[in-house]
Amino acid sequence: YIKLPIKEKIDNDISFGHGYISIALVFFRLWKCTNNQRYYNLGGDFYNEFYSSFEEHKKEKFKDLNFSWCRGILGILIAELEIMNIMDNEKHSSVVEALEPLLLNMDMSGNDGLCHGNIAVTEYFLKKYEYSRNEEDLKMAQIIVQNIINRNHRENRFMLRYAKGFKSIGLFTGLSGIGYQMLRVSNPEKIKSILD
């Protein structure tokens, strides 16, 4: 038995970590596993809330969005790919069409971590590769990893958030996440995503 959430306003937040799209994805996954129509309907309701907010942000050229997984473009794109795969249709591709060019035109971030940084961008291209088997997507993920490694060699460190006196070794904001994602890029069929 699952207690269904009471709809509440999420302050027009379209991010994966704090917005409606992640809730929609959960219900669409439940529907896919159970074939229970109420989960599909709830997924659709939450997706419509997301899409309405998305259209408002689009009018403002996504000025409040960053490129992170949790609060930005990257998380939205990954969720869209997941929903498109579950729904087995192209209905949601307008979101990808609007946001992917922003991702492709971004410069390297000052952070290499999995939640907020450059290594997370590899996950979008690995998801695309997983669903399309387009080798160009896998190649793009490999290029991003190589760029991160090259900068690490120049700077003699990965660009991470550090607390004075402590190395950042955690999964989402530290070295563990970078290492895990590098393993995933080297073998995406065997190493599963931790961002979806």
Model-inferred region functions:
Residues 12-31, 65-82, 113-129, 170-184:
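Well-ordered alpha-helical segments within folded domains of soluble proteins
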